[in-house]
Regions:
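PLP-dependent amino-acid enzyme catalytic core
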Residues: 1-353
Length: 353
């Protein structure tokens, strides 16, 4: 792996020896949580888009969670960072793509709590000017390393390698998988489901569906578990933007069951609904349908959707509405990702450099 930049160290070594990572917590006492999200995030109708589609659409604005430029990943980080602190960890190692909103918010949160962040990205550093989230990582002085391989799975070995380096140096790292997709991380959206239930109680008609983009699967898993916990009648519909639908559904099912157990419940969970056909040219690359959907939302509601996740999920919802296959109010999770709007040509439909 190639080190892109190693910033100033702001964290002091922790006093505890725990460094098992995000998958190590056992059920029992309620998991600790740090307060990151400015909750509740708004739930509001999208009237002009609704008229365009002939279906009532509401936006759940998790692009307005608070830290940085907002985003859904803060919800899982409330539990993951709290667990790292409880284990006495002095550093956190995670990874994803070079334009990852997950790693950006993880790094910001770590810095706030005196934990040193380390980020592993697939691909190569390149020689051009950093843009979007990568530029923010560099500006913050975060240690970012590239695997030199195009496969996203190369990040997993990179996280393990950096974690090993830190342990060998006497540090106490907290490794977290890509996207924070662990049962503990999924608890963030179990909690969000309680928040959403209170907001939906004031509506005249309950929603029939809750739509979102699905990548690492933790957000959908938390929402599936949360819907079961709250007794919600809506269907949680994930639109995969990366992995095959069958693989995504399996991950959602496994994470949702484990998150429900951590939450102290054992509800009957429905089979995950994961839609496919909207990835376009590939993960991290805009699609024509996604860009058209994002432009429509911006022009009708003044809301920007990121090209990697939100735009593709909205394209699926729009297509289903126009085909007459969607009935009743639909909630769309706006999950953030604003920095990717300023990364290369992501917003115009060409692959970012």
């Amino acid at each position: 792996m190639t080190a892109v930049t190693t910033g100033p160290r702001t964290a002091s070594p922790g006093t505890g020896a725990g460094s098992s990572g995000a998958g190590s917590r056992r059920s029992g006492a309620a998991p600790p949580r740090v307060d990151l999200v400015l909750a509740p995030t708004p739930l509001h109708p999208a009237p002009r888009l609704s008229r365009e589609l002939g279906v009532p659409v509401l936006f759940k604005r998790d692009d307005l969670t608070g830290a940085g430029l907002g985003g859904n990943k803060l919800r899982g980080l409330e539990f993951l960072v709290a667990d790292a602190l409880a284990q006495g960890c002095d550093s956190l190692v995670t990874g994803a793509g070079p334009q990852s909103n997950w790693t950006m918010l993880a790094a910001l949160t770590c810095l706030r709590y005196g934990i040193e962040p380390h980020v592993v990205c697939y691909g190569s550093a390149g020689t051009g000017r950093a843009e979007g989230n990568l530029r923010l990582h560099r500006w913050l002085g975060v240690d970012v390393r590239f695997t030199g391989e195009a496969e996203r799975s190369s990040v997993d070995a990179g996280i393990e390698a950096v974690t090993g380096e830190l342990r060998a140096a006497g540090r106490h790292p907290y490794p977290v998988p890509r996207g924070g997709a662990t049962p503990l991380g999924a608890l963030g959206y179990v909690r969000a489901s309680l928040e959403l239930a209170a907001q939906l109680a004031g509506l005249d008609e309950p929603p029939a569906g809750l739509w979102l983009a699905t990548g690492s699967c933790g957000t959908q898993a938390g929402l599936v578990a949360g819907a079961a916990v709250t007794g919600a009648s809506y269907q949680v519909v994930g639109v995969t933007v990366s992995r095959p639908a069958e693989e995504a559904a399996g991950r959602v099912r496994e994470l949702a069951a484990a998150a429900a157990t951590l939450a102290g419940t054992d509800p009957d969970l429905p089979a995950p609904d994961v839609r496919t056909g909207w990835i376009g040219p590939g993960y991290g690359t805009p699609s024509a349908a996604g860009q058209a959907a994002a432009r429509l939302v911006a022009q009708t509601e003044g809301v920007f959707l990121d090209p990697v996740f939100g735009a593709k999920a909205m394209a699926a919802l729009i297509a289903e509405c126009r085909a007459g296959r969607v009935h009743g109010p639909q909630v769309f999770l706006v999950s953030g990702g604003a920095p990717t709007l300023f990364a290369g040509d992501l917003c115009t439909g060409s692959e970012a450099s």
